[in-house]
Amino acid sequence: MSVTKGNRRDSSVEFDNNYFKIHDDAVRLIRNKFGASKDIREEAVNYIRVVSSKILSDILDIGKYIRIANSIYPKNKTELEERRVHQDKAIGLCYDLLTKYQLIMRTLGTKDDKYTVEAGNIVHENNCLKAWRSSDNKRFKDLG
């Protein structure tokens, strides 16, 4: 089925838009040292610095894998599998990102509700990526 020219519009890729929210949240948290009190130990400051670097690296990798997967329009089973691998890597990094936030909360002794919005955005991103992968399974079932 084709869409008439007057009814065409840009596709809003929700997982792509949400990715930028996750990035902005992380930058804000890092700038604020994850809400740690001013009198935290030097070891905790160093830990925050190390984990912050890994968090930003993971977020940039999520974006990279989303871009790579989205740039592959599968014409055969191999291309479909390659696209799926990149989707899976992005999904895995979302879980890893949540784990890093949990580790920081435990290290700093912050309350569970401190990063609710940020964690919610990551979970939403993960669900969007899974829905995208599921949609691909339906769209390209004749290739697999």
Can you name each region flagged by the protein language model?
Residues M1-G144:
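Amphipathic alpha-helical assembly/interaction segments
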